[in-house]
């Protein structure tokens, strides 16, 4: 049985992605990232491999792809890369299926990720400078810009072990 990690009071939990869910996860990725045109993106300006089944399968095999669940419903996913010490985590990508947007699920997913890596004291991620939605989202969650480079804002959030 797969271990699940639940965010407090949210009902959402994450588990390592299951092989039979990859195609559904990729469909969600496509729908989620295609909504970026609504917040300043140009059509087709999506993350690398966002629509690749093979790449998502590889991420799952390597243990980086997590599926976000509410009860038995798959609502989104995350791709994360802990360092060898588990003290630092790079959040490569998160997405919530566009049919579930504007329900707080992105916040819940980030809470699940942070809860799933209790030894991590540093969380890092990046997002395009033009994307007002994601920049406001990460700042609202306590992430701070540490660098701007090549059209991307690089964010970091630190925490003291034992506090979330």
Which residue stretches match the model-derived regions?
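Conserved acetyl-CoA pyrophosphate-binding loop and the N-cap/start of the following alpha-helix
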Residues: 100, 104-112
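A short, internal acetyl-CoA/4′-phosphopantetheine-binding micro-motif in the GNAT/acyltransferase core
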Residues: 94-101, 127-128
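A short helix-loop-beta-strand connector motif used in the catalytic cores of GNAT acetyltransferases and
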Residues: 53-67
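A short beta-loop-alpha structural element at the N-terminal edge
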Residues: 12-27
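Conserved active-site alpha-helix within GNAT-family acetyltransferase domains
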Residues: 107-108, 129-147
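Conserved beta-strand in the GNAT
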Residues: 67, 73-82, 88-90, 95
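Conserved GNAT-fold acetyl-CoA-binding loop/helix
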Residues: 30-55
């Amino acid at each position: 049985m797969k271990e699940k990690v639940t965010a407090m009071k949210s009902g959402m939990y994450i588990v390592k992605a299951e092989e039979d869910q990859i195609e559904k996860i990729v469909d969600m990725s496509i729908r989620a990232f295609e909504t970026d045109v609504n917040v300043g993106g140009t059509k087709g300006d999506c993350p690398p491999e966002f629509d690749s089944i093979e790449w998502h399968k590889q991420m799952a095999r390597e243990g980086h792809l997590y599926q976000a669940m509410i009860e038995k419903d798959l609502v989104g996913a995350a791709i994360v890369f802990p360092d060898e010490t588990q003290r630092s985590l790079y959040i490569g990508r998160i997405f919530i299926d566009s049919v579930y947007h504007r329900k707080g699920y992105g916040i819940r997913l980030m809470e699940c990720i942070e809860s799933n890596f209790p030894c991590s004291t540093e969380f890092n991620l990046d997002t395009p400078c033009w994307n007002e939605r994601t920049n406001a989202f990460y700042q609202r969650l306590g992430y701070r810009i540490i660098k701007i480079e090549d059209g991307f804002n690089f964010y970091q959030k630190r925490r003291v072990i034992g506090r979330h």
